[in-house]
Structures are given as C-alpha cells and as structure tokens.
C-alpha cells in the first residue's frame, strides 16, 4: 500500500515570511500539529510544530525543578518573551531538518521513517519537493489495526 492512499491532502501551509502571530493562531487555535513552510512555488522549506515555538519561549525542562532552579520562569515571563519575539517569522523558527515521504512510498517505509526519526507526522512531497499532504503515524496504526485485523489474527496463530 502506498502513502497516497492514507495521506491527508491539502495541508494548511505558511510561507517563509508568515509572522509569528499567525503561526501561533494556526497551531494554537486551529489545533494543527504541524505547519509546512513553503516557498512561492509551494516547495517544502521546513516545518513548524508547537514544540518549535515553545523551544524559543520555555527554558529547558530541567530548569523547572525548583531545587535546581529556584527562580523558574512564570507564565508572565513567558508572555513577556512572546512579546519580544513578535518580529519573528516562519523562516526564523522553522525546523529545516525535515524528513519527508513521497506519495508512492510504501506505507511501511513511511512508518519506519516516522519511528526511526521519532516524529509522528511526515510531510508528503512530489519529486520537485512541492507539498502534497502529510502522513500521520496514528492513521497508519488505525489502518493496520482496523483494516488489517486478519493479518494480526494470523500473527497470533504463528506465535502459538
């Protein structure tokens, strides 16, 4: 089975100059998990996740342990940091180390990419790196566990 049969099409994208305020709105209020960043020709240049945004705002988790860091930042400190970063754009915060899949990639290869790279979503691009959609780990698992129930029944018999 190919990625194109399970991928989610027409993803919401942002361009390199999209302001941080719009990105916050899309990831926060629209409950998107990933925003592909594209150029004028819709070619994938990077991705932005909620984690990418938070890395700029929240100190390393170890700093939250009060015994090691008694002056841990407050929500107000984080709000102040957001205000300081309003000039940032997608190109400033995007992750350019992006793993992607192609529409004709085998589903199990895409699943392997997801697992090896510790990501839950892969952008799907064509040969020209134009964004076509994205494949989500849970969609693959849902397919495997619901649609291929008979496969797992056979595996159970083999184990016995």
Where are these regions (language model features)?
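A short, polar/charged loop-to-alpha-helix boundary motif
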Residues: 54-70, 141-155
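Short hydrophobic beta-strand motif reused across regulatory alpha/beta modules
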Residues: 47-49, 53, 134-141
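Contiguous N-terminal and early-domain "leader" segments and peripheral loops that mark the onset or edge
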Residues: 55-61, 106-109, 118, 130
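Extended hydrophobic
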Residues: 115-116, 120-123, 127, 136, ...
């Amino acid at each position: 089975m190919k990625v194109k049969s399970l991928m989610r099409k027409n993803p919401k994208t942002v361009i390199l100059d999209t302001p941080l305020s719009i990105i916050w709105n899309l990831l926060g209020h629209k409950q998107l998990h990933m925003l592909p960043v594209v150029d004028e020709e819709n070619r994938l240049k990077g991705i932005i996740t909620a984690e990418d945004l938070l890395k700029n705002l929240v100190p390393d988790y170890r700093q939250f342990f009060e015994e090691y860091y008694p002056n841990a930042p407050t929500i107000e400190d984080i709000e102040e940091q957001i205000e300081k970063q309003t000039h940032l754009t997608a190109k400033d915060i995007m992750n350019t180390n992006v793993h992607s899949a192609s529409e004709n990639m085998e589903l199990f290869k895409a699943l392997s990419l997801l697992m090896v790279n510790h990501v839950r979503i892969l952008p799907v691009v064509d040969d020209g790196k134009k964004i076509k959609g994205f494949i989500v780990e849970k969609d693959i698992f849902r397919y495997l566990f619901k649609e291929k129930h008979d496969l797992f029944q056979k595996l159970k018999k083999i184990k016995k």
